[in-house]
Amino acid sequence: MEEFKGYLQKGGLKQQHFLYPLLFKEYIYALAYDQGLNASTFNEPDDISGYDKKYSSLLVKRLIKRLYQQNSLIRSVNKDKQTRFVGHNKNFYYQMVSEGFAIVLEIPLSLRLVSSLKEKKDIPKYQNLRSIHSIFSFLEDKFPHLHYISDILLPYPVHLEKLIQILQCWIHDGPTLHLLRLFFHDYHNWSNCITTKKSSYGFSKENPSLYRFLYNSYVVEAESIFVFLRKSSSYLRSTSFGPLLERTHFYGKMKHIGVTRCNDFQKPLGLFKDPMMHYVRYQSKVLIASRGTYLLLKKWKSYFMNLWQCHFDFWSEPSRIHINQFPKFSFYFLGYLSSIEMTPSSIKSQMLENYFLIDTVTPKFQTIIAISPIIGSLARARFCNLSGNPISKPVWTDLSDSEIIDRFGRLCRNLSHYYSGSSKKQSLYRIKYILRLSCARTLARKHKTTVRTFLQKLGSEFFEEFFMEEEKVLSLMLSRTSNPLHQLYREPIWFLDIIRLNDLVNHL
């Protein structure tokens, strides 16, 4: 980042073509190479391909020149995406350049964000371009006190040029935007990527960084009205609501929010008259919960559609917005089946010498793991069958024992990490059991023995200590409780660090 900043400060910002020369810098592609190595996915590949060759400025120049020669090289042979020319796959050239291209696009936005933080200015709205979600914390505390929820699918742009216009507001660089148009024309069906899961999956796999950047730049515009409403109707007004949108500023937000007192509100009556609402998003799925009436939500629905179509030129349909009432409605979000559960309780009250038992009902936000999609994902990855019975993974038997255990352990920790927000842990225990027994069967198959014999030889404590590593770390964080491990399994713990697409969530 310091090299980028030094380059831009030497007059690069005053030039019209300040981004395009960065495409020929070798360290840009070295950075993309490191990101490719460090990225982890649910279906972890056995090897990392596509980045096995060194980059040079001469190679990049040749690749960009070949990309622009659409008529003679790319689109001349049957319009087949798997066509090979000059000994390479055409898609391979696009993947090489697009990864570095995405990093170059993020440079000016990252520098503006860093400068705004140092000067303590308001965070710009493009600060969450690297995140795939906008989640305001304490969701489990807000939802039980709200009455209605709107389930919304964000609209899609009517034309690819609309995405270029969005970026033109931030990046004044003609050659860079022309190169972006070239990528759009190659993936002519990218307009369906926002709503079509199949095409989105293919594009995101081939160009993950570019896909994330372009998609989130569009979503920032589409959700800007929701952020405005969230600011206007919130009860807790912290120093700045900008950091609430970005997962990297979560801990900074915790420092700003303190105990709210009545004297902190300048207009307490006006605040409490406003209908409180809560807003969360994952990819194109948006949830807006409100204390208002059903009629108010209907007005919001009409307002959103007109605003998107008339102001942003985003096409939206009434069927993409559904209004439901708590607590009758259960919804899928972030891989959880969430609902509001009414918990009965009794309160003992005393008036003079008389005692009374008052029955009351307390709403509680429940998050349950949707076990069926997870088992389906594990079955497709060959960890179990469709019934959830663990099986061995033959393709890993050629690896060393430590590598096999490390892969299973990493996957188990990732799932525990992701689904730690569940209020009921039984499904999470089942997932751990499937992975643990699948690991044992894989090792037993490698050594040509039975699972029982293998476990007796190594001891079951070895697996327990390995899979309990994360729980021990978290128990130290909760050491102030009398029984931290029990508290860990009983209460949900949320980790807001989702910065990429999650295959398990996409199956819902």
UniProtKB/Swiss-Prot annotation:
Family, as annotated: Belongs to the intron maturase 2 family. MatK subfamily.
Gene Ontology CC: chloroplast
Biological role: Usually encoded in the trnK tRNA gene intron. Probably assists in splicing its own and other chloroplast group II introns.
Organism: Wolffia arrhiza
A GO MF label: RNA binding
Designated name of the protein: Maturase K
N-terminal signal peptide: none
Biological processes per GO annotation: mRNA processing; RNA splicing; tRNA processing
Subcellular location: Plastid, Chloroplast
Keywords: Chloroplast, mRNA processing, Plastid, RNA-binding, tRNA processing
